[in-house]
Structure formats: C-alpha cells, structure tokens
C-alpha cells in the first residue's frame, strides 16, 4: 500500500443533501448542486496530528481535534485498510452551512473517507466506504447521496446488508431550499419525536412515499403534491422552526408542488417547475422575513455525480 509523501494533497468535492423529502424518513435523500470542498494534505507528524482550516462565513462554529468528523472518518479508513495513521491537514471551503438540515455532517464524513482513501491509493471499495459512512453517521439518508449522488433510497435488508436503490428524478424538477439564519441540531430534532407512531400514520406514509417517488420519476406535479406529506416526523418538528409553517404555505401559494422540512431542519425544501422557481424562492424568503428570520433560498438541481476527488496538481 502506498505511503503518501509529505505534502501530497487531494481535493474532494462533496455535495449537500436534502433528506426525508417528506415521507421518506431516514431512508430517502437527494444530492444537490451545492458543494463543500475539502483539500486534504499529508503533513509531518504522527497519526494523531490533525489540523483544520475553515474558509467561509460559518467556519467559526466548527472545531478540529479528535472529535472532528473528517478526522474520525479518516481514522476509520486507516483502520479498515490496515494502514498506519498519518498526520493530515484539512482545508474546507464551506458552502453547505452547518446545522441547517443540508447534510453538512455528511459532507465531512464522506470527505474524510474519500480523501483518506485517496491519499493511500484507494485500497477500500466504494461499497466499503458506504458502509463506514452509514456506521459513522448512524443513518443513511444523507451520507448515501452525498457519496453516490442522485436520489437514493436506502434500506437495511433482512440479511442486515444495506441496500441502495438509485431512484429517478425528472430533470425538469427544481429544488428551492430556503436556508434560514437560525440553527437546529439533529439531536434536538430527533428528541422532539415520539418513540412510536400509530400504525395508521405509518400506512399513510408508505402510500405517500409511493406517490412521491412516482411523481419524481415522471415529473408529475400532482403526484409530488399528493406524496410530499409526512406523519412520522414533521408533525413534531415544525414547532421547532420559527415561521416554518408560514414559509411552507407561502411556497405552496407561489406554485410549489410540495414542501417539506429538509432533513432535521430548519431549512425548508420546496419542489417546483423551473418556471415557478423564482416566485417560490421570493415567497419563502419574504415569509421568513415577516417572522423576523433572515434567509436565502437558492434554486438548486439534483447533483448526480456524488463525491469525487482529484490530485491537487490537477485543479
């Protein structure tokens, strides 16, 4: 196995993700064309040395050290590959804001896995990296599309093996993601949920998920509208998002087919046609403004490539 030289550098681009998309709780997620870029460099020192440099307005909220997800993921690669740990520096150009329900943690995990694997000659397969990513994150709906790209449905089979199905997303469907200047941790959002739900609610979600997937496959706005509803997590999480219900209603009134909490929130996802995108974006920002919350609402596309890396010299 190749031992990277001091100064050897790889650049890893990892997309944001929107998870759940209404009824697909903890199993459905999509990659979006908004990337964090991680530049990982072998530096002098032992395997416990890790340096983190953040570029971006929200970098002050992130910390280095042994609990950093990039570092933890890299350590898992060294262990799985039988590789002695190496000292690394990670420079992050932050475009995916943390604690907003856009998979920022997943980008760090995937970057640590892909970058560390690349630095030592890629001894681990994509399938092994996927397994490690899910194990670190604890659920698959962000890390899977972050690694693979596209719209992904992930489930653990009876064999206990993770199975991933790449689902279709009609290119005409656009995602408006309203990103507020407020934060919500995944742990807080999960604590708001009950330990169990009525069978009737689970049945409704199964039907809604079927409609949503068919709507995304065909570009049928009516199916997306009927399918983008949830009874498992959103009823308990909307109250955590200041002005969230008003933002949702504004998006629907402006022509969005459907609207949902992105991941654990507080960002809100609206699906619509390209024609209605600007109006939906404007309506969502204005609704949050009325609630006293600053926000932005970019119009995004599905990102199908997933994470990818290149040597620094090839930039």
Curated annotation (Swiss-Prot):
HAMAP family per UniProt: Homoser_kinase (MF_00384)
Broad class of the protein's primary localization: cytoplasm
InterPro entries: GHMP_kinase_C_dom (IPR013750), GHMP_kinase_C_sf (IPR036554), GHMP_kinase_N_dom (IPR006204), GHMP_knse_ATP-bd_CS (IPR006203), Homoserine_kinase (IPR000870), Ribosomal_Su5_D2-typ_SF (IPR020568), Ribsml_uS5_D2-typ_fold_subgr (IPR014721)
Species of provenance: Synechococcus sp. (strain CC9311)
One MF annotation (Gene Ontology) recorded for this entry: ATP binding
Catalysed reactions listed for this entry: L-homoserine + ATP = O-phospho-L-homoserine + ADP + H(+)
Class of enzymatic activity (EC top level): transferase
Tree of life domain: Bacteria
Biological process according to GO: threonine biosynthetic process
Name recorded for this polypeptide: Homoserine kinase
Pathway field: Amino-acid biosynthesis; L-threonine biosynthesis; L-threonine from L-aspartate: step 4/5
UniProt-listed Enzyme Commission number(s): 2.7.1.39
Protein task: Catalyzes the ATP-dependent phosphorylation of L-homoserine to L-homoserine phosphate.
Family indicated by similarity: Belongs to the GHMP kinase family. Homoserine kinase subfamily.
Keywords of the record: Amino-acid biosynthesis, ATP-binding, Cytoplasm, Kinase, Nucleotide-binding, Threonine biosynthesis, Transferase
Residues reported to bind ATP: 97-107
Matches recorded under PANTHER family: HOMOSERINE KINASE (PTHR20861:SF1), HOMOSERINE/4-DIPHOSPHOCYTIDYL-2-C-METHYL-D-ERYTHRITOL KINASE (PTHR20861)
Compartments in which it is found: Cytoplasm
GO cellular component, one term: cytoplasm
Gene that specifies this protein: thrB
């Amino acid at each position: 196995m190749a031992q990277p030289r001091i100064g050897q550098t790889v650049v890893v681009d990892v997309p944001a993700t929107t998870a759940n998309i209404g009824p697909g709780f903890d199993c459905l997620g999509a990659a979006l064309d908004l990337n964090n870029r991680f530049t990982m460099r072998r530096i002098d020192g032992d395997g416990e040395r890790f340096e983190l440099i953040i570029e971006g307005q929200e970098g002050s909220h992130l910390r280095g050290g042994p609990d950093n997800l990039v570092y933890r993921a890299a350590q898992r690669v060294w262990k799985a590959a039988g590789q002695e740990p190496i000292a690394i520096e990670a420079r992050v150009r932050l475009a995916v804001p943390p604690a907003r329900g856009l998979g920022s943690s997943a980008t760090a995990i995937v970057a640590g896995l892909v970058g560390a694997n690349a630095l030592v000659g890629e001894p681990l397969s994509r399938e092994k990296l996927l397994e490690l990513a899910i194990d670190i994150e604890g659920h698959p709906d962000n890390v899977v599309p972050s690694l693979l790209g596209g719209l992904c449905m992930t489930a653990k089979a009876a064999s206990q093996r993770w199975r991933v199905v790449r689902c279709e997303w009609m290119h005409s469907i656009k995602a408006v993601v309203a990103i507020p200047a407020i934060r919500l941790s995944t742990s807080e959002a999960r604590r708001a949920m009950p330990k169990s739900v009525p069978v009737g609610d689970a049945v409704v979600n199964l039907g809604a998920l079927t409609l949503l997937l068919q709507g995304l496959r065909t570009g049928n706005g009516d199916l997306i509208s009927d399918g983008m509803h949830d009874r498992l997590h959103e009823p308990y999480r909307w109250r955590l998002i200041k002005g969230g219900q008003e933002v949702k209603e504004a998006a629907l009134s402006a022509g969005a087919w459907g609207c949902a909490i992105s991941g654990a929130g507080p960002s809100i996802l609206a699906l619509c046609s390209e024609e209605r995108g600007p109006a939906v974006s404007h309506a969502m920002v204005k609704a949050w403004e009325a609630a006293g919350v600053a926000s932005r609402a970019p119009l995004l596309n599905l990102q199908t490539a997933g994470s990818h890396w290149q040597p620094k010299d090839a930039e």
